[in-house]
Curated annotation (Swiss-Prot):
Annotated protein name in UniProt: Outer membrane protein assembly factor BamA
Originating organism: Haemophilus influenzae
Quaternary structure and partners: Part of the Bam complex.
Location(s) in or outside the cell: Cell outer membrane
Gene: bamA
Pfam families per UniProt: Omp85, POTRA
Domain POTRA: 22-89, 90-170, 173-259, 262-341, 344-418
Similarity remark: Belongs to the BamA family.
Leader sequence segment: 1-19
Length: 793
């Protein structure tokens, strides 16, 4: 009986003490009904008709109370009936969150779920209050000191409850003042320049809101400034953050102890060097001896030592930099104390987070092999190659030790996949060209194999095109790729505002093989076939020169062409998805081969580079240039439908697609005299484009989401010309020539400037651009605003 009483006290219950064991002819459960009542009955250690003891009652009370589903549990005897009485906690039937914008609803719901507040869980009010308190503390950490978080519980019938988290985020507190103390050598203005947070001023639009996390980053920036300018002993000794009574303004005081400014007099490497002393010693040449000490240089050498040893299998190397100060001469010496550790073997390569991409697809990008010495360079190269596929938002790698082994590890790549399938719809509007539409369905990682499958189509007032494409990047184990396209186009250019009049039907196919040379270089070769049927074309001067060279008769053209394509590609981009560093370049060509009706060739060159301006790659300069040249051979001219034009996203924003190039010259009334100058674009056989962009942090977007959006300020330029114009124009009358520009001049450049925005949204890629021409010519078709929208799968 004493044991039963103790159990009752421990569990906060009251239990009637039985005088003696008895046979329970019936068992009654009070306080609940339905499924919960049946669950309690099923959990009882006794059944009706069985003998009940004090120990049985204690077990009943203990097991029900420990389940966490009840606020109170009692058990007692009423005659020959065992009565179990409970007060059940509410079951959560719904969870709602209102008033939040800074913290995403999804993030709050994930935290609620993790803390036991999802639908179907037992409601524990104390824990709910603790959760609300932690959210309020988070708001305070980001400068929203007046934010309120109120958990509201609405009790419903049948022991159910709804939870509402009502949030009022309020505004961030402003940094009212910033004061430095103890800085005798470095001015307060210089220290303030190192910080993102700045005191409030009437002209400041952002940067004046106080945020704890940013304040910590700024303090580290101040430390880095001192350490990289010789103040090796500099410390921030105290920070004082004072709120006003309304919690709307913050006054900050930062105390520093600068110490002396040192020069670096010498450096050496000692310790367990894994037998690589000769390879490590040259790394010290990166240091600037007898010059101002810079902690960043020391960190670079530390990383270089780890990387060099990592290439030989020492994946757990530790490097400690020990300074030896000479205060009298204001110099210091650095000793790099190295422990290479054990040489490691890679047991397995493992992948996490790839729910769509097959492991075998990711393994194709690996350079580190299982069962070989660990090589940090090859492991990092695998990460870079995964990034370049464009299949992933983020790629991280780590090494996991193996239980029971001190020289084996697993290399783990953790990826976050992005939507690689898309259904895109594009639309553009021009002052003269009107509305045009483009649609495409593309899957860059088909069934997780890495293969790309696409169906693309364009529909506008003057035509339709369809292209089916397939690329297998892992056609062979050696990395040879196989790609191909089947295409169909049907255009009535007489309805186009920017192209010379004719009707064209085209279909064909091509196949391409790509061969890797090394990690950054590859080349390709391909074969293709194209059939063209052209009719209803008006008599136009440039077109007539082509027809004469081909000796066509009548008002119809049919050609069958076979071509050989070739090219070289270079890629050192850090990732395929919104790159911030590296270069991508290509040279290519295509030439018709024997058996073709036409005889012509086309050459192209493209290069694009990304150059980060800061360590976090938030500010990036991007430059892009391209050139193309085409011509006929064997006394045949370049087909007029193979000429170049510019305009639109990808070549010259701010101008309508395909609207830039030499114009058509028609024969008026079909009399054979070419004297009607048109605004229709016939194109040229040479083109150059150039673009410079400053990629900037997107305003009002959190740091976490910056990698899904891209904002840039750009300048575009392009020129399209006819290199044979000097001889071509001889067939025109002088009165026509005087009204024509010199189409042979490459200096007839168009240019525009504007702002671009890209967003990899949950529904797919969104691209917007607004550009204003800064150099244009008469009759140019301006299209300032362009955008495309899409949906992903």
């Amino acid at each position: 009986m004493k044991k039963l009483l103790i159990a009752s006290l421990l569990f906060g219950t009251t239990t009637t003490v039985f005088a003696a064991p008895f046979v329970a002819k019936d068992i009654r459960v009070d306080g609940v009904q339905g499924d919960l009542e049946q669950q309690i009955r099923a959990s009882l250690p006794v059944r009706a008709g069985q003998r009940v003891t004090d120990n049985d009652v204690a077990n009943i009370v203990r097991s029900l109370f420990v389940s966490g589903r009840f606020d109170d549990v009692k058990a007692h005897q009423e005659g020959d009936v065992l009565v179990v009485s409970v007060v059940a906690k509410s079951i959560i039937s719904d969870v709602k969150i209102k008033g939040n914008s800074v913290i995403p609803t999804e993030a709050l719901k994930q935290n609620l779920d993790a803390n036991g507040f999802k639908v179907g869980d037992v409601l524990i009010r104390e824990k709910l209050n603790e959760f609300a308190k932690s959210v309020k503390e988070h708001y305070a950490s980001v400068g929203r000191y007046n934010a309120t978080v109120e958990p509201i519980v609405n009790t419903l019938p049948n022991n159910r409850a709804e939870i509402l988290i009502q949030i009022n985020e309020d505004d961030k507190a402003k940094l009212a003042s910033l004061t430095f103390k103890g800085n005798e050598s470095v001015s307060s203005s210089t220290l303030q320049e190192q910080m993102e947070l700045q005191p409030d001023s009437w002209w400041k639009l952002w940067g004046n809101k106080f945020e704890g996390a940013q304040f910590e980053k700024d303090l580290q920036a101040i430390r880095d400034y001192y350490l990289n300018n010789g103040y090796a002993k500099a410390q921030i000794t105290k920070t004082d953050v004072q709120l006003n009574d309304e919690k709307t303004k913050v006054n900050v005081t930062i105390d520093v102890n600068e110490g002396l400014q040192y020069d670096l007099r010498s450096a050496r490497i000692i310790g367990n060097l894994g037998g690589m002393s000769a390879e490590l010693e040259p790394l010290l040449s990166a240091l600037h001896l007898n010059d101002t000490f810079r902690r960043s240089d020391i960190a670079d050498v530390e990383n270089a030592i780890k990387a060099k040893l990592g290439e030989r299998g020492y994946g757990n190397t530790t490097v400690n930099s020990v300074p030896d100060f000479d205060d009298a001469n204001k110099t210091l010496a650095i000793t790099f104390v190295v422990d290479a550790g054990r040489r490691l073997t890679v047991r397995q390569l493992r992948f996490e987070g790839n729910t769509v991409s097959a492991d075998s697809t990711l393994r194709q990008e690996m350079r580190q092999q299982e069962g070989t010495w660990y090589n940090s360079q090859l492991v990092e190269l695998g990460k870079i190659r995964l990034d370049r596929t464009g299949f992933f938002e983020t790629v991280e790698n780590r090494i996991d030790p193996i239980n029971g082994s001190n020289d084996e590890v697993d290399v783990v790549y953790k990826v976050k996949e992005r939507n690689t399938g898309s259904i895109n719809f594009g639309i553009g509007y021009g002052t003269e060209s009107g509305i045009s539409y483009q649609t495409s369905i593309k899957q860059d990682n088909f069934l997780g194999t890495g293969a790309a499958v696409s169906i693309a189509g364009t529909k506008n007032d003057y035509g339709t095109s369809v292209n089916l494409g397939y690329t297998e990047p892992y056609f062979t184990k050696d990395g040879v790729s196989l790609g191909g396209n089947i295409f169909f186009e049907n255009y009535d250019n007489s309805k186009s505002d920017t192209s010379s009049n004719y009707k064209r039907t085209t279909y064909g196919s091509n196949v391409t093989l790509g061969f890797p040379v090394n990690e950054n270089n590859s080349y390709y070769v391909g074969l293709g076939h194209t059939y063209n049927k052209i009719s209803n074309f008006a008599l136009e001067y440039n077109r007539n020169l082509y027809i004469q060279s081909m000796k066509f008769k009548g008002n119809g053209i049919k050609t069958n062409d076979f071509d050989f394509s070739f090219g070289w590609n270079y890629n050192s981009l850090n990732r395929g998805y919104f790159p911030t560093k590296g270069v991508k370049a290509s040279l290519g060509g295509r030439v018709t081969i024997p058996g073709s009706d036409n005889k012509y060739y086309k050459l192209s060159a493209d290069v694009q580079g990304f150059y980060p301006l800061d360590r976090d790659h938030r500010w990036v300069v991007s430059a892009k240039a391209s050139a193309g040249y085409a011509n006929g051979f064997g006394n045949k001219r370049l087909p007029f439908y193979q000429t170049y034009t510019a305009g639109g996203i990808g070549s010259l924003r701010g101008f309508a697609y395909g609207s830039i190039g030499p114009n058509a010259i028609y024969a008026e009334h079909g009399n054979g005299t070419f004297n009607k100058i048109s605004s229709d674009v016939i194109g040229g056989n040479a083109i150059t484009t150039a673009s410079a962009e400053l990629i900037v942090p997107t305003p009002f977007v959190s740091d976490k989401s910056q990698n899904t959006v891209r904002t840039s300020l750009f300048v575009d330029a392009a020129s399209v010309w006819n290199t044979k114009w000097k001889s071509d124009k001889n067939g025109l009358e002088s009165k026509v020539l005087k009204d024509l520009p010199d189409y042979g001049k490459s200096s007839r450049i168009r240019a525009s400037t504007g702002v671009g925005f890209q967003w990899q949204s949950p529904i797919g890629p969104l691209v917007f651009s607004y550009a204003k021409p800064i150099k244009k010519y008469e009759n140019d078709d301006v299209e300032q605003f362009q955008f495309s929208i899409g949906g992903s799968f």
